From Swiss-Prot:
It comes from Oryza sativa subsp. japonica. Its cofactor is Fe(2+). Involved in strigolactones biosynthesis by cleaving the C(27) 9-cis-10'-apo-beta-carotenal produced by CCD7. Produces the C(19) carlactone and a C(8) hydroxyaldehyde. Also shows lower activity with all-trans-10'-apo-beta-carotenal producing a C(9) dialdehyde and the C(18) 13-apo-beta-carotenone. Its main location: plastid. This is Carotenoid cleavage dioxygenase 8 homolog B, chloroplastic. Keywords: Chloroplast, Dioxygenase, Iron, Metal-binding, Oxidoreductase, Plastid, Transit peptide.
Length: 569
């Protein structure tokens, strides 16, 4: 393809990926010249006080070693690999779980965890953690007992791959292999329309205010509704508005009454802020933030909100339309690093859609924001926004460290890039610059910090505790669970040699008045090839119980909790 054709193709991709580009909105200030800142299942209702039912199918065999990529690309599978990085062997399973310890009797509901679980098709192995087809895991708790399940999410991408034995949609680093030049041209046409983008919803899982459960990824078409009781794929979640766009934040902010999301616009670089009422499929336009730097919007995997404001981050890791056209990925995949473009934090009023602050901040890289809240003066006036995130010291290396051959490496070297709790202070007094500091000594959590949760009652409000994955070094991936105390600036850590825990999801005890009164639940892939749901006391961060699967499960990403009142029949 000629450079001219490539440039034209990139423009077409940008047009396809823009969201609500023609919608009117309020723009962030373009000025501020000056010095740069530095710095899943058996129906849950069937679980009774009686002994749990026996498995309805035999447990799967041990997960299969992933094959080496044809042609020698990528890392292969060996017998010494951890089960966390091996493909799940069976499409679905359900049955009773053996419990060690005592589960709290108040723990009554369903824990769901989503994430990639299938990284190979026949003898073809995928490159990257984020390429895997979605595997939904469920653990239902009741009366001190647990029933577990897993199932593949029936996305169009997964069904097509299963039917044809090859990648048929564009995943994070994988693209369909064209048979000839005409086939390649046809693929470009489908990319421009968005039809070749994946709907593989392997990232998040959320419960909407009306009880519907969605699995999500960064493509809007990858919003898929599932049944939390059966793990059946109900179907695509169809947005009924005309906001458009093909990509959005993988992590919306969801409460009992509303749903907030960001839609990047690659034509006029910026972000559309939208909200949706519980029970509705219609997103409503709230406002627009124009980017202050760079050729494209910064990546927005997640974002925080406060009671009255939406915080829109703009980091130098920016979307790159031309990288979408590549058959082979760059080390930054769909992104480019534009340090010269600056880093910014924008604050929008929820009620009016107006930009109330747009400040330059030191460079940063984050996948996940933890929380945000409003700082007030003695008279109760909001003077600043505090926003915390899992920050990777402005180092983009973490993206390539998540290649599967890196994760499967058993070299024993300390190759996990450092991370910290980064705390932004965004003044609302018209200042040009904001601050970014380290909220606590990173050695408290082994200089690893990601995959976080908090007490849901404190979303958008002042808080003290966060639960996340940390590190015990040397390691190549977060291998501990961490409770962070942001007041005392300390951390408590749980670690089991050779295990790979996933996001610790905090479930508050009903009626609790203290922020850390509850449990943190994490799915753990153990060194011996087994898997279990670990339940830690929210206060002491000591093990309460573990519900053991009869087989090992691959690593997963994000979780949600469905209380019994929501999923009972």
């Amino acid at each position: 393809m000629s450079p001219a054709m490539l440039q034209a193709s990139s423009l077409c991709v940008s047009a396809a990926l823009s969201g609500a580009a023609s919608r009117p909105g309020r723009l962030a200030s373009q000025g501020h010249q000056g010095k740069r800142a530095v710095a899943q299942p058996l129906a849950a209702s069937a679980v009774t006080e009686a002994a749990p039912p026996a498995p309805v199918v035999a447990p799967p065999a041990r997960p299969v070693d992933a094959p080496r990529r044809r042609g020698g690309r990528g890392g292969g599978g060996g017998g010494g690999e951890l089960v966390a990085w091996k493909s799940v062997r069976q499409e679905r399973w359900e049955g009773a779980l053996e419990v060690d310890g005592e589960l709290p009797l108040w723990l009554d509901g369903t824990y769901l965890r989503n994430g990639p679980g299938l990284w190979n098709l026949g003898d073809y192995g995928f490159r990257h953690l984020f390429d895997g087809y979605a595997t939904l895991v469920r653990v239902s708790f009741r009366g001190g007992r647990a029933v577990g399940a897993h199932r593949q999410i029936e996305s169009e991408a997964y069904k097509a791959a299963r039917a044809h034995g090859k990648v048929c949609y564009r995943e994070f680093s994988e693209v369909p292999k064209p048979d000839n030049f005409l086939s390649y041209v046809g693929q470009l046409a489908t990319l421009f329309s968005g039809s070749s983008l994946t709907d593989n919803s392997n990232t998040g899982v959320v419960m909407l205010g009306d009880g519907r459960v969605l699995c999500l990824t960064e493509t809007i078409k990858g919003s898929i509704q599932v049944d939390p009781d059966t793990l059946d794929t109900v179907g695509k979640f169809q947005y009924t508005d005309k906001l458009g766009g093909l990509i959005h934040s993988a992590h919306p902010i969801v409460t009992d009454t509303e749903f907030w999301t960001l839609i990047p616009d690659l034509i006029r670089p910026g972000y559309v802020v939208a909200r949706m009422d519980a029970g509705s499929n219609e997103r409503q336009f709230v406002g627009r933030v124009d980017c202050r730097g760079g050729p494209a919007p910064g990546w927005v995997h997640s974002f925080p909100v406060t009671e009255h404001y939406v915080v829109v981050p703009e980091m130098p890791l920016r979307y790159c339309a031309k990288n979408l056209l590549r058959a082979e990925p760059t080390p930054l995949y769909k992104f480019e690093w534009h340090l010269e473009s600056g880093s910014y934090m924008h604050v929008m009023c929820k009620a009016s859609g107006k930009i109330v602050a747009s400040v330059e901040v030191p460079p940063f890289v984050t996948f996940h924001f933890i929380n945000a809240y409003e700082e007030t003066d003695e008279e109760g006036r909001v003077t600043a926004i505090i926003a915390d995130c899992c920050e990777h010291n402005a180092n983009t290396a973490i993206l390539d460290k998540l290649r599967l051959h890196n994760l499967r490496s058993s070299s024993g070297q300390d190759v996990l890039p450092d991370a910290r709790v980064g705390r932004f202070r965004i003044p609302l007094d018209g200042s040009q610059f904001g601050e970014l500091e380290t909220a606590l000594d990173p050695e408290e959590h082994g200089r690893g910090m990601d995959m976080c949760s908090i007490n849901p009652a404190h979303v958008g409000r002042e808080y003290r505790y966060a639960y996340a994955c940390g590190a015990r070094r040397p390691c190549n991936f977060p291998n501990t669970l961490t409770k962070v105390d942001l007041v005392e600036r300390t951390a408590k850590n749980w670690h089991e040699e050779g295990s790979v825990p996933s996001e610790p999801f905090f479930v508050p005890r009903p009626g609790a008045t203290e922020e850390d009164d509850g449990v943190a639940i994490s799915m753990v892939s153990a060194k011996d090839g087994s898997g279990y749901a670990l339940v830690l006391d929210g206060k002491t961060f000591e093990e309460v119980a573990r519900a053991k699967f009869p087989y090992g499960l691959p690593y997963g990403l994000h979780c949600c909790w469905v209380p019994r009142k929501r999923n009972s029949k």
